[in-house]
């Protein structure tokens, strides 16, 4: 919104700063962190009073988790406030990619909020119906992908079918055009990302730091993909307008830092599905917008690993009646093996950093 003040730069030269994505990204990061820091304590106290027993703890989980009973959930409200507030101030709201990303952020956050509400009120892990939840997620994601696809098709910078095509790392000109089915593919990517982060969110600080790492990585990708000079130099696909997504991701990082202040062990609050679905959906949307869906599987490899562990566990158990892991998602498996919570969290952070660097390296390998 503040970018519109650039029109007054003829009279106030300092307003030229608002033209620069890098400046507004830093400002969004600072603003979102400040929002969470300022309003976090009030939100936490309000949720603690309203929720009473807080998030239900799994009876079959590690014994160390029972001491977390009574910790409030829905901390994603703090994160959403930071992201949306900072984005409204610093991002270009006339940009289709920004609007589509915020649509997914808020839509997935609302789904997660309802799921958290059901779990808290029923004191059960069974919240929103799985099929209904996925269906609504696909509708929201599909709408966002459709409008982003139309925008990319209209730009015509890389051919008439670029907007509906899948791009591959290492090969700039190797594209597979899916036509209208790209909406389905993009929706799958966004929904998958949202639920992958949701599965990862099981320990204090485990999900939020890898999310910030992924957000920083995709902030770089969005900035480069949206800049014709850098895109041509690196031989990556130029997608006009996606550079503005760096501002939104700056807000994600700032909100994540603010939330981590309260989520550091022992956590004063959990983000819940409200936060994890929204954050994962946001990252997934940026990946689709910048044509780096496959690279997201590398940068977000930790989330992929967590998701695969659940799929393998459930599938193998249905076929044989036995389990591959002591408990899924896989971070609980390592807890059962004797790792402390801090060991699991920090080691998974290290994995996330390594995968992010590996994913970013694909930008130069052409």
UniProtKB/Swiss-Prot annotation:
The chain crosses the membrane at residues 27-47, 71-91, 93-113, 134-154, 174-194, 205-225, 245-265, 268-288, 294-314, 343-363. Keywords: Cell cycle, Cell division, Cell inner membrane, Cell membrane, Cell shape, Cell wall biogenesis/degradation, Magnesium, Membrane, Metal-binding, Peptidoglycan synthesis, Transferase, Transmembrane, Transmembrane helix. It holds the Pfam family Glycos_transf_4. It is found in: Cell inner membrane. GO terms for biological process: cell division; cell wall organization; peptidoglycan biosynthetic process; regulation of cell shape. It catalyses: UDP-N-acetyl-alpha-D-muramoyl-L-alanyl-gamma-D-glutamyl-meso-2,6-diaminopimeloyl-D-alanyl-D-alanine + di-trans,octa-cis-undecaprenyl phosphate = di-trans,octa-cis-undecaprenyl diphospho-N-acetyl-alpha-D-muramoyl-L-alanyl-D-glutamyl-meso-2,6-diaminopimeloyl-D-alanyl-D-alanine + UMP. It is a multi-pass membrane protein. One of its GO terms (molecular function) is UDP-N-acetylmuramoyl-L-alanyl-D-glutamyl-meso-2,6-diaminopimelyl-D-alanyl-D-alanine:undecaprenyl-phosphate transferase activity. Pathway: Cell wall biogenesis; peptidoglycan biosynthesis. InterPro entries: Glycosyl_transferase_4, PNAcMuramoyl-5peptid_Trfase, PNAcMuramoyl-5peptid_Trfase_CS. Its cofactor is Mg(2+). One of its GO terms (cellular component) is plasma membrane. Disulfide bonds: none annotated. Belongs to the glycosyltransferase 4 family. MraY subfamily. Catalyzes the initial step of the lipid cycle reactions in the biosynthesis of the cell wall peptidoglycan: transfers peptidoglycan precursor phospho-MurNAc-pentapeptide from UDP-MurNAc-pentapeptide onto the lipid carrier undecaprenyl phosphate, yielding undecaprenyl-pyrophosphoryl-MurNAc-pentapeptide, known as lipid I. This is Phospho-N-acetylmuramoyl-pentapeptide-transferase. The gene is mraY.
């Amino acid at each position: 919104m503040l970018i519109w003040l650039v029109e007054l730069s003829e009279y106030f030269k300092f307003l030229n700063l608002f033209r620069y994505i890098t400046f507004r990204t830093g400002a969004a990061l600072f603003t979102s962190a400040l929002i969470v820091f300022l309003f976090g304590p009030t939100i936490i106290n309000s949720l603690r009073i309203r929720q009473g027993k807080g998030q239900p703890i799994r009876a079959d989980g590690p014994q160390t988790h029972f001491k977390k009973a009574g910790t409030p959930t829905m901390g994603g409200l703090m994160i959403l406030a930071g992201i949306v507030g900072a984005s409204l101030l610093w991002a270009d709201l006339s940009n289709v990619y920004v609007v589509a990303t915020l649509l997914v952020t808020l839509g997935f956050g609302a789904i997660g909020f309802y799921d958290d509400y059901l779990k808290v009120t029923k004191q059960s892990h069974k919240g929103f119906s799985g099929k209904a939840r996925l269906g609504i997620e696909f509708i929201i994601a599909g709408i966002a992908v459709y409008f982003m696809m139309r925008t990319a098709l209209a730009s015509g910078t890389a051919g008439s079918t670029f907007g509906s095509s899948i791009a591959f790392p290492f090969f700039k000109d190797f594209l597979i055009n899916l036509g209208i089915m790209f909406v389905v593919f993009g929706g799958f990517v966004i929904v998958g990302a949202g639920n992958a982060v949701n599965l990862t969110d099981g320990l204090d600080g485990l999900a939020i730091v890898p999310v910030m790492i992924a957000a920083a990585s995709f902030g770089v990708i969005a900035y480069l993909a949206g800049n014709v000079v850098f895109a041509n130099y690196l031989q990556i696909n130029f997608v006009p307008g996606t550079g503005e997504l760096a501002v939104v991701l700056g807000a994600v990082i700032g909100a994540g830092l603010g939330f981590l202040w309260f989520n550091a062990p022992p956590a004063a609050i959990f983000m819940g599905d409200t936060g994890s679905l929204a954050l994962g959906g946001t990252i997934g949307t940026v990946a689709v917008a910048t044509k780096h869906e496959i690279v997201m599987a590398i940068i977000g490899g930790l989330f992929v690993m967590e998701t695969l562990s659940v799929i393998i566990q459930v599938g193998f158990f249905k076929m044989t009646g036995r389990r591959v892991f002591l408990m899924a998602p896989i971070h609980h498996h390592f807890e059962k093996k004797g790792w402390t919570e801090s060991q699991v969290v920090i080691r998974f952070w290290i994995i996330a950093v390594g995968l992010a660097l590996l994913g970013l390296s694909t930008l130069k390998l052409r």
